[in-house]
């Protein structure tokens, strides 16, 4: 069995660790950056955790490593499980090590192939970078219970370098269900659909959040359906960018159906009825990753790429403007844009190559 290292100690990291432990009998190493060890330290105090899944579960003992070098030593697959905001800092830490015998997996990815190309030392770069559109699970931790609320029937991945069938097989077995391979990491970047529903949903919830209304309705049950017209408009603009760049993707609703199944006939019905999302709380503050990450670090870049290739995205722009007003920050200036990635003035081909980690 290929050794696995997990970087991050949040919901996804612990669910992946519990899944590997209970399904495959494997104990991956877990490391978290010193600057963000709240969950890591909680787990250390708890000791043993319990995976609670729809088909299997049980107790498992996470192997926590304080030292990054120890955590990744001998790992065939190194999983980067932190949100976009935390990826760059970890990549800078990884740049100190020889990764040439490992595959780095961004779960999920967010232009991670590009970030690796710009950050890691070429001589010691990983065999390949794999990016995914999403997590394999809907999940969260409640104290010592790691809840695998839903297991996706598949999820999409792409690699910067061709992988042998043997390596692909060792990668695929790490998940409950096999992933679907896309041709380009650039397609993965535009198929991370968090910026489609999250920003529109939290902006719809703004009055309830800022007025402190209690109890606040559940995020996916109430606020995303309330904003569904905007969600669909953003999704259509996303696919227009994808088409213009010659990449592949699907609608947000198509992904939801493919991942989770169910009988929903449209996006609104899915968000209102999918049990895996039913208890997800609405954020308590507007200063939340649905804006500070999904807008500032992904949607802003979508908008700038759209402008560079001549695609009109008025709904995306309106969300960026509204998020800027809420955060009292001009996200088009402070967010992750083409210039900050050294892609100012780049054409469509150069943008795709960069997102592919070339």
Curated annotation (Swiss-Prot):
<keyword id="KW-0520">NAD</keyword>
<keyword id="KW-0560">Oxidoreductase</keyword>
<comment type="function">
    <text>Reductive condensation of pyruvate and arginine, lysine, histidine, or octopine to form octopine, lysopine, histopine, or octopinic acid, respectively. NADPH is the preferred cofactor, but NADH can also be used.</text>
</comment>
<protein>
    <recommendedName>
        <fullName>Protein ocs</fullName>
        <ecNumber>1.5.1.16</ecNumber>
        <ecNumber>1.5.1.11</ecNumber>
    </recommendedName>
</protein>
<dbReference type="GO" id="GO:0047830">
    <property type="term" value="F:D-octopine dehydrogenase activity"/>
</dbReference>
<dbReference type="InterPro" id="IPR013328">
    <property type="entry name" value="6PGD_dom2"/>
</dbReference>
<dbReference type="Pfam" id="PF02317">
    <property type="entry name" value="Octopine_DH"/>
</dbReference>
<keyword id="KW-0521">NADP</keyword>
<dbReference type="InterPro" id="IPR051729">
    <property type="entry name" value="Opine/Lysopine_DH"/>
</dbReference>
<keyword id="KW-0192">Crown gall tumor</keyword>
<keyword id="KW-0614">Plasmid</keyword>
<dbReference type="InterPro" id="IPR036291">
    <property type="entry name" value="NAD(P)-bd_dom_sf"/>
</dbReference>
<dbReference type="InterPro" id="IPR008927">
    <property type="entry name" value="6-PGluconate_DH-like_C_sf"/>
</dbReference>
<comment type="similarity">
    <text>Belongs to the lysopine/nopaline/octopine/opine/vitopine dehydrogenases family.</text>
</comment>
<dbReference type="GO" id="GO:0047827">
    <property type="term" value="F:D-lysopine dehydrogenase activity"/>
</dbReference>
<dbReference type="InterPro" id="IPR003421">
    <property type="entry name" value="Opine_DH"/>
</dbReference>
